[in-house]
């Protein structure tokens, strides 16, 4: 926040004459009160803070690596994967496929998933997928299908999110939104599972509906039109109020219908692990579902500490808020974001 406010003061000083003439609008400073009221975010973790905190730069500094080194996304994914493997009581030999599902990939090819596969010594196959903030739930659904069809015994689904790489730190409405994180999930045949931390996947449901209200236009064709290079739409941009108005009822409706299709009453759900983008969105979604305000334990919040970590957020919430649930307890893992994209995964504690 201090680097943003320093940038604002420098900008206003440099353009004081134009601002005085009404040719430019003065930029407004940010504040902790504004950020917490708008989002519920109080802190975050980032891969590199020095570059972000430099008012002259305000971009993380992540040096390019040689092709002989593992990429930074691979490095993150491997660290999370090893923790997930240990928690599941599995080794690389037990995994038949790798899905890297995240909101931004650092290169077109070779796939980060294939690199992760090599780094961990996993046989089989790997591929990348991007459904923005819903990448994890869509990845779980893809992994579930692979298990159900006999294509694999177990799938490693991992979400390396360096969200600060596509965040405009000079935009007051979004400079605080994202943090960096990586999560990993192992989906495997129930009859082979040995972990003490198991959940049965009862059902999955996905929905997409096209919208321009959340966009990132960065891509390989940008260089074909130099006039667009460096414009703000090449980073994360959104119409926040429109997103709030559109997405909240869509998520509540999808989860409600998904539960009903599986003959589960909303009141039977012990926990909602929702996408961690905005506290106000989650409060409204659970209020629509429950018909009342959710208790803190019913819809745990981690975005106050981690900020929006895109696809990783709901999985972090699941990881940190599951151990107290008894066997047989029902929970819903749900994500929502750009696309629009919404994923719902009904889980039962083993």
From Swiss-Prot:
Keywords: Acyltransferase, Transferase. The keyword Nucleus does not apply. It holds the Pfam family ACP_syn_III_C. GO terms for molecular function: 3-oxoacyl-[acyl-carrier-protein] synthase activity; beta-ketodecanoyl-[acyl-carrier-protein] synthase activity. The keyword Protein biosynthesis does not apply. InterPro entries: ACP_syn_III_C, ACP_syn_III_N, Thiolase-like. Its EC number is 2.3.1.207. The active site is at residue 133. Pathway: Lipid metabolism; fatty acid biosynthesis. This is Beta-ketodecanoyl-[acyl-carrier-protein] synthase. It comes from Pseudomonas aeruginosa (strain ATCC 15692 / DSM 22644 / CIP 104116 / JCM 14847 / LMG 12228 / 1C / PRS 101 / PAO1). GO terms for biological process: fatty acid biosynthetic process; long-chain fatty acid catabolic process; secondary metabolite biosynthetic process. Belongs to the thiolase-like superfamily. Beta-ketoacyl-ACP synthases family. Catalyzes the condensation of octanoyl-CoA, obtained from exogenously supplied fatty acids via beta-oxidation, with malonyl-[acyl-carrier protein], forming 3-oxodecanoyl-[acyl-carrier protein], an intermediate of the fatty acid elongation cycle that can then be extended to supply all of the cellular fatty acid needs. The enzyme thereby shunts fatty acid degradation intermediates from the beta-oxidation pathway into de novo fatty acid biosynthesis. It catalyses: octanoyl-CoA + malonyl-[ACP] + H(+) = 3-oxodecanoyl-[ACP] + CO2 + CoA.
């Amino acid at each position: 926040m201090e680097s943003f406010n320093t940038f604002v003061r420098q900008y206003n000083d440099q353009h004081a004459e134009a601002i005085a003439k009404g040719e430019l609008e003065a930029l407004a400073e940010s504040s902790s009160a504004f950020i917490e009221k708008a989002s519920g975010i109080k802190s975050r973790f980032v891969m590199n803070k020095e570059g972000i905190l430099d008012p002259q730069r305000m971009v993380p500094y992540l040096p390019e690596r040689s092709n002989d080194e593992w990429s930074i996304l691979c490095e993150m994914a491997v660290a999370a994967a090893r923790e997930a493997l240990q928690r599941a009581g599995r080794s690389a030999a037990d995994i038949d496929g790798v899905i890297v599902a995240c909101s931004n990939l650092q290169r077109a090819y070779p796939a980060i998933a294939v690199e992760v596969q090599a780094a961990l010594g996993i046989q089989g196959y790997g591929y990348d997928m991007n459904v923005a903030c819903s990448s994890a739930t869509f990845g779980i659904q893809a992994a579930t299908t692979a298990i159900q069809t006999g294509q694999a015994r177990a799938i490693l689904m991992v979400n390396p999110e360096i969200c600060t790489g596509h965040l405009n730190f000079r935009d007051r409405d979004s400079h605080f939104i994202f943090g960096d994180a990586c999560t990993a999930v192992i989906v495997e045949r129930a009859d082979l599972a040995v972990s003490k931390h198991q959940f049965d996947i009862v059902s999955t449901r996905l929905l997409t509906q096209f919208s321009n209200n959340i966009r990132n236009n960065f891509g390989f064709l940008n260089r074909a039109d130099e006039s667009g290079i460096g414009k703000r739409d090449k980073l994360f941009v959104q119409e926040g109020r429109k997103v709030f108005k559109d997405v909240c009822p869509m998520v509540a409706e999808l989860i409600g219908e998904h539960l009903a299709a599986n003959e589960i009453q909303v009141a039977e759900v012990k926990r909602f692990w929702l996408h961690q983008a905005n506290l106000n969105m989650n409060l409204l979604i659970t209020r629509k579902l429950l018909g009342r305000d959710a208790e803190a334990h019913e819809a745990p919040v981690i975005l106050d500490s981690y900020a929006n970590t895109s696809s990783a957020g709901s999985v972090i919430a699941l990881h940190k808020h599951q151990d107290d649930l008894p066997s047989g307890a029902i929970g819903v893992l749900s994500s929502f974001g750009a696309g629009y994209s919404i994923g719902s995964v009904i889980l039962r504690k083993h």
